[in-house]
Amino acid sequence: MVVSKMNKDAQMRAAINQKLIETGERERLKELLRAKLIECGWKDQLKAHCKEVIKEKGLEHVTVDDLVAEITPKGRALVPDSVKKELLQRIRTFLAQHASL
Amino acid sequence: MKMEEMSLSGLDNSKLEAIAQEIYADLVEDSCLGFCFEVHRAVKCGYFFLDDTDPDSMKDFEIVDQPGLDIFGQVFNQWKSKECVCPNCNRSIAASRFAPHLEKCLGMGRNSSRIANRRIANSNNMNKSESDQEDNDDINDNDWSYGSEKKAKKRKSDKLWYLPFQNPNSPRRSKSLKHKNGELSNSDPFKYNNSTGISYETLGPEELRSLLTTQCGVISEHTKKMCTRSLRCPQHTDEQRRAVRIYFLGPSAALPEVESSLDNDSFDMTDSQALISRLQWDGSSDLSPSDSGSSKTSENQGWGLGTNSSESRKTKKKKSHLSLVGTASSLGSNKKKKPKPPAPPTPSIYDDIN
């Protein structure tokens, strides 16, 4: 019973993701997020942080994995609340539209 | 698929919220990843730190925000007092007036090129001795003078007349000419100041006459010098010019016509005769290159006297007095200058000369 529920859950998520991509909503949301993050200075803050990290490690020894490990938590934390709220709102309306089908 | 979507509607809000959060986290992660790729590429390509500047230089180039200063911290109207030194006449001119001055001084205009050329040619013919030949070459070349392009072309066609007879760059010729001109300048007390005008007290009657046929000549009230501009100089009126001429040359002297004194490139028989005679002279000196200087000069003078009348008639514009003082310079200048057509008007002046 539990396994089937888990399975159903995963299937549902896959279906929603599929829908997001098919309708192009995911692409739109990504673009919106990008624009908002640049607008609010998230990118500049992160870049400053990047510089510190890179100087610390040395220019030659920087790898993408290092950067991702260092940057992603920071990036997630630095997203302003307003941006987060707006994005979540749009995701919810999308879900509501497609859940009612 | 249909079944699952139907089941979506049955999900409670908390489940939907969880999914929404998940999607959001996914998107943020995507953005972060994209940013990381961007930075990594910038680092590996070496342009990541390009926009960095060290704080010292940042301090140096800080934008200044003070009254009376521009953003670089300079007094913004200091250029008003700037002066430039003209490379041609060595006078210092206010920067805002420099371009118009240079145009006049270098002779880049239509009219001013004539004036400037005449001025330089005059001063060279009368003042210089050794470098006479080279300078004349430069002046008459006119390659650099935009306004006189047409003139230069005409001159080229003139040169066709000369070329078979003589080589203007022949060292022997220039040598003998230099010699002659050196003698001439010693005997010529004429002083010509290019920049300020002419003090007429120092001029002899012949020089005065030739000056007045080529230049405005009106005497300034302030400097007591004669105006060295063209006959049409806008600063003085025809009345003033006439008055000066009457004062110097007597009541018979009228204002010479400007048109006739300008170049007009016609060629008459006396010119070609003069050329032929010069050719003969050239040939003779070719035959005896070891001639002493004195014999050459006598030869030259003899030739000059023989063609004196035609010379002075052709070049009376500015060299008639020279042909009277010393014949050699008229020879030299005539060689470089275009032959001037006989100027029929203003007979009173020219009758005096001839």
Curated annotation (Swiss-Prot), chain A:
Cross-linked sites for Glycyl lysine isopeptide (Lys-Gly) (interchain with G-Cter in SUMO2): K74
InterPro entries: TF_ENY2, TF_EnY2_sf
Keyword Ubl conjugation: yes
GO cellular component terms listed in the entry, alphabetical order: DUBm complex; mitochondrion; nuclear pore nuclear basket; nucleoplasm; SAGA complex; transcription export complex 2; transcription factor TFTC complex
Protein keywords: Acetylation, Activator, Chromatin regulator, Isopeptide bond, mRNA transport, Nucleus, Protein transport, Transcription, Transcription regulation, Translocation, Transport, Ubl conjugation
Subunit structure: Component of the nuclear pore complex (NPC)-associated TREX-2 complex (transcription and export complex 2), composed of at least ENY2, the isoform GANP of the MCM3AP gene, PCID2, SEM1, and either centrin CETN2 or CETN3. TREX-2 contains 2 ENY2 chains. The TREX-2 complex also associates with ALYREF/ALY and with the nucleoporin NUP153. Component of some SAGA transcription coactivator-HAT complexes, at least composed of ATXN7, ATXN7L3, ENY2, GCN5L2, SUPT3H/SPT3, TAF10, TRRAP and USP22.
Role this protein plays: Involved in mRNA export coupled transcription activation by association with both the TREX-2 and the SAGA complexes. The transcription regulatory histone acetylation (HAT) complex SAGA is a multiprotein complex that activates transcription by remodeling chromatin and mediating histone acetylation and deubiquitination. Within the SAGA complex, participates in a subcomplex that specifically deubiquitinates both histones H2A and H2B. The SAGA complex is recruited to specific gene promoters by activators such as MYC, where it is required for transcription.
Name of the molecule in the record: Transcription and mRNA export factor ENY2
Source organism (scientific name): Homo sapiens
Gene name of this polypeptide: ENY2
